[in-house]
Regions:
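Non-ligating segments of multi-cofactor redox enzymes
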Residues: 1-215, 219-222, 230-249
């Protein structure tokens, strides 16, 4: 595709099918390396935070990074840079039965109730001694312990990313940028659902296509449809396993 054509396509508001599958294979491998490099952070915060409470400030830093990132790429931070998500997916996931995540856990009412409960708990705890920075750190460590424990139990009983389906920060990211960098399906999908089996969030993909198709991609000349999946982690696992190479981010 020429630079001029690419600019015209962008100016017209068209979303193009991006990287080829071979490139996404490299991206998926890179994501895996990143996850193995950062998963131990959650263990350091939980264990080390008992003696050094200031380690707890890693928690709000990750939370803030997730919210800011959400405005640009939805739940990208969840899928690539969240230490707990990496821990649940790569470490605890080895002993998970990988059962389907119950759909009621994804319902907005439940998710926002969890968000309100967690934020309320954090505010009440901090209010007990708001002038002590170490107390703030202890509160963050306590929250990390509680939520990670819930995540581990759910991962062992159901699916590695069960907690992530209603994680308060994930909910925020979905709310502010769930439509950013969307997953797209080009013409030629045979509905084999290999993408859904590979998805770490256990998302429904094939049946969530936007009924209004996008204009054909200049690079492939195939029509495309945006997948309505605000909880997509932008991990590329589905892109790599697609036998027809019709998926893209």
């Amino acid at each position: 595709m020429s630079v001029q054509t690419e600019r015209e396509d962008t100016a017209a508001g068209h979303q193009r099918m991006p990287r080829p599958t071979e490139d996404w294979q490299k991206q998926v491998a890179r994501r895996k390396r990143i996850q193995f490099a950062i998963w131990a952070i959650v263990v350091v915060v939980i264990v080390g935070g008992m003696w050094w409470p200031l380690l707890g400030f890693v928690v709000p830093i990750v939370m803030l990074a997730g919210i800011i990132g959400g405005f640009f790429r939805g739940r990208y931070v969840c899928g690539w840079l969240c230490p707990r998500g990496a821990f649940l997916e790569r470490i605890v996931g080895r002993i998970s039965p990988e059962r389907p995540i119950p759909q009621w856990l994804r319902r907005p009412a439940f998710r926002w109730a969890v968000f309100a409960a967690l934020m309320g708990f954090m505010a009440l705890q901090i209010a007990q001694n708001p002038g002590d920075v170490n107390h703030w750190g202890q509160v963050f460590v306590r929250i990390c312990i509680i939520t990670t424990a819930i995540g581990v139990v759910l991962a062992i009983a159901v699916h590695p990313r069960t907690w992530c389906s209603f994680c308060p920060m994930g909910t925020m990211q979905s709310a502010v940028g769930g439509s950013r960098a969307p997953l797209m399906i080009a013409e030629g999908c045979v509905e084999c659902r290999a993408c859904e089996r590979a998805c770490p969030m256990n998302l429904k993909i094939v049946g969530q296509r936007n009924p209004t198709p996008l204009p054909p991609s200049p690079s492939t000349e195939r029509g495309r449809a945006v997948v309505n999946a605000p909880d997509c982690l932008k991990c590329g696992e589905c892109v790599v396993v697609c036998p027809k190479r019709v998926l893209g981010l």
